[in-house]
């Protein structure tokens, strides 16, 4: 049995599952519920291939590069395209995930102010106080150190997944098929909704940062066989991810009237808030919903924040060097944390719509790195020509459609 499936492969499957299923899962039903049943069914059909193909392509891109053992995406880009384009891709990578950090911080603030609004009047001073508290507490957890923070995040993965599964099963008793069958019209508006839903799907199923670590680990352990090992794990992990996420999405949308989903979308909160808005929602659901939403988004925030701060530190170092100033890494890192935290606080106070940020900025930028860069490279780099497949071509087209939302959506 060990030859068929090892303990190590099981652990990596859990790692991929834990990073893919989280805060993004809470936003997907909001967009799909607003878009209509046709878009939901199309998403269900394409979820697995459009999760597997792009992440597989990124693995191929990393593993095919002739870089030193510990280098991931950045090293592969530099190997194929040189330092200048490598710096541009690194900057895009930083911006894409900095926006993810902002989305989670805004959504956490909104979830907390939504609960406070039941007891007190929310004005700009209250929002600023909550925003400051959110940024401060998340930074305090972050400053505990990578090891301690990752241990806390790892501990939270299974309770969160168990809650999603429990809630999906619990809501079966409230299913109303008419909520979906009443939205089955297909027209030009439906096509538009399919188009603008692509970035939210990309955002919800993407877990780009861990792919670099995953590919490096497989290469260190299996050498030339690394890609085969990656595909073996990814096929199984992504099937489980897609089935569980889609079960959660369908269960929510079969239970929640569209009006509540639209209210949650406008307020920039998650599907758990939409559930708690319903007049017949039990007290335990309202309480657990806000706790789980905040914990899930905090986990995802911190998981992304490490990479954002590392990227910001490098950008600060480079900028200071260009003006003739050389500071220690500790100084550059501290300045980066202050700058990122300050911008995050301001954005939380401004309160842009979370879904709009996903389909206008974050989703398209992630698509550039995950969908377009590795697949387009198979047409630009002769060494990657063997990886040209129908799946990679479809991934490239979907990536271009996703990016087009940023400019025309």
Locations of regions flagged by a protein language model:
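Membrane-interface "cap" regions at the ends of multi-pass membrane proteins
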Residues: 1-33, 51-56, 392-403
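Extracellular loop-to-transmembrane helix junctions
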Residues: 7, 29-63, 67, 85
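Hydrophobic transmembrane alpha-helices that form the core helical bundles
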Residues: 54-62, 70-120, 290-315
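Membrane-interface loop-to-helix entry segments
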Residues: 108, 112, 128, 132-174, ...
């Amino acid at each position: 049995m060990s030859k068929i499936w090892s303990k190590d492969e099981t652990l990596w499957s859990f790692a991929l599952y834990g990073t893919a299923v989280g805060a993004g899962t809470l936003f997907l039903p909001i967009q799909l519920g607003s878009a209509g049943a046709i878009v939901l069914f199309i998403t269900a059909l394409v979820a697995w291939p459009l999760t597997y193909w792009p992440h597989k392509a990124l693995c191929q891109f990393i593993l095919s590069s002739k870089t030193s053992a510990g280098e991931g995406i950045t090293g592969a880009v530099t190997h194929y395209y040189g330092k200048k384009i490598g710096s541009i891709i690194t900057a895009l990578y930083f911006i894409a995930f900095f926006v993810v950090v902002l989305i989670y911080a805004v959504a956490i603030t909104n979830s907390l102010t939504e609960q406070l609004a039941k007891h007190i009047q929310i004005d700009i001073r209250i929002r600023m106080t909550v925003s400051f508290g959110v940024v401060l507490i998340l930074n305090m957890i972050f400053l505990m150190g990578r090891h301690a923070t990752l241990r806390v995040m790892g501990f939270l993965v299974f309770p969160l997944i168990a809650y999603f599964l429990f809630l999906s099963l619990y809501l079966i008793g409230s299913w109303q098929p008419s909520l979906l069958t009443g939205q089955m019209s297909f027209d030009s508006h439906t096509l538009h909704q399919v188009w603008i839903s692509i970035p939210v799907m990309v955002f919800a199923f993407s877990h780009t940062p861990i792919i670099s670590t995953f590919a490096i680990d497989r290469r260190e352990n299996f050498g030339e066989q690394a890609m085969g090992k990656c595909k073996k794990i990814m096929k199984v992990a992504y099937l489980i991810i897609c089935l569980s996420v889609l079960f959660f999405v369908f269960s929510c949308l079969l239970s929640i009237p569209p009006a509540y989903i639209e209210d949650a979308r406008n307020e920039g909160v998650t599907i758990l808030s939409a559930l708690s808005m319903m007049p017949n929602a039990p007290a335990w659901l309202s309480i657990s919903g806000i706790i789980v939403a905040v914990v899930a988004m905090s986990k995802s925030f911190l998981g992304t924040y490490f990479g954002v701060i590392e990227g910001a530190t490098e950008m600060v170092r480079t900028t200071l060097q260009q003006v003739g100033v050389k500071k220690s890494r500790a100084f550059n890192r501290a300045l980066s944390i202050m700058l990122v935290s300050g911008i995050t606080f301001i954005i939380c106070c401004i309160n842009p719509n979370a879904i709009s940020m996903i389909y206008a900025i974050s989703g398209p930028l992630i698509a550039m790195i995950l969908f377009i860069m590795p697949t387009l490279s198979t047409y630009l780099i002769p060494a990657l020509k063997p990886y040209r497949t129908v799946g990679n071509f479809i991934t490239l087209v979907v990536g271009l459609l996703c990016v087009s939302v940023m400019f025309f959506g």
